[in-house]
Regions:
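A residue-level marker of the well-folded mature domains of exported/periplasmic proteins
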Residues: 18-312
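Gram-negative bacterial Sec-dependent N-terminal signal peptides
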Residues: 1-20
């Protein structure tokens, strides 16, 4: 069963105390801005639940290390485990490593999400919404700017081992396939691995070709910011280029407030973090949980960005 839950609903359902429980978590990597916000929020939330012991470890973007971490955490006798998976194609291996210990995947969708047993669940946001919201808003902005007869641009992918990156890029092509947006053409797409620095280098390389372009779509804010930094360093007027991304991080909103960033999509770190802990507690107590719990994405533009300050 799939369930969509608002953050307000999750906050309302917050547990203030539990019978003594231990939950362990492993994250793909600590060195990631958005995941840091997610992790910090989870530590804070868990700390407010009496009787709950919560620990988290860094997989350093190493799948083998993460699988060992899952096994080690299980061996410690925890009541449940939360996993932000390194490689979304390795769901079966991670699920097997957890054994009979209740498991909740958070943020990144494992490839075995449709085969999870009753003791496992997935809490995140529906990635079909993320790339679609961003790309469609850029499409509308291009039309409003008089570029509806033809617009060319670039697509920056996240890690190709990550389901979110694959889906967000597919979303872009699905939007371009719509009658309203089929005037958009992708000149080139490459991965910048969610990284601001890699995106800056990639954008600099693209610009060196001398191709004219009207938009840049990125799978996350960090890459969008890197692209913007490269364009500004080259002396481009950001009013001439539409840039869209995903996350609505605080850094991204600062860039948007400066007039350099056009579109992002709020990915609710609080909703995903609290939702994953709540699901882990329920599974640890033998309660049933929906196999997929989705926290909605929300479109963010300069007009409504004030509603999202300090949220991620």
């Amino acid at each position: 069963m799939i369930k969509t839950v608002s953050t307000a609903s999750l906050i309302a359902m917050m547990a203030s105390s539990v019978a003594a429980l231990e939950i362990g978590a492993t994250f793909s990597k600590f060195d990631d801005n958005w995941l840091t916000v997610l992790r910090t929020g989870m530590v804070e939330y868990a700390g407010n639940i009496d009787g709950l012991s919560y620990q988290q470890v860094d997989a350093s973007d190493d799948l083998a290390k993460q699988i060992d971490q899952v096994k080690n955490i299980v061996a410690q006798g925890v009541d449940a485990i939360i996993v932000n998976i390194v490689d979304t194609s390795a769901g079966a291996a991670v699920s097997a490593a957890a054994g009979d210990t209740p498991l909740v995947y958070v943020n990144r969708e494992p490839d075995n999400v449709n085969e999870l047993p009753p003791t496992q669940a997935f809490v995140a946001s529906n990635e079909i919404e993320s790339g679609t919201l961003s790309a469609f808003e850029v499409c509308k902005n291009l039309r409003a700017a008089g570029k509806g007869s033809g617009a060319r641009g670039y697509l920056m992918n996240g890690q190709l081992t990550n389901q979110a990156a694959v889906q967000r890029s597919k979303d872009v092509y699905d939007v371009i396939g719509m009658d309203m947006c089929n005037f958009m053409e992708i000149i080139d797409e490459q991965t910048a691995n969610w990284s601001r620095d890699e995106a800056q280098d990639l954008m600099t390389s693209w610009m060196s070709s001398g191709e004219s372009f009207d938009f840049v779509l990125a799978n996350n804010d960090e890459m969008a910011i890197g692209a913007i930094q490269a364009m500004k360093a080259a002396g481009m007027d950001m009013a001439d280029v539409q840039v869209g991304g995903v996350d609505a991080s605080q850094d991204a909103l600062l860039v948007m407030a400066a007039g350099d960033y056009d579109v992002t999509v709020f990915q609710d770190s609080v909703g995903q973090g609290t939702g994953s802990i709540d699901a882990a507690i329920k599974l640890a107590n033998g309660e049933s949980v929906d196999s997929k719990v989705y926290i909605p994405f929300v479109l963010v533009t300069p007009e409504n960005m004030g509603d999202f300050l300090d949220k991620n």
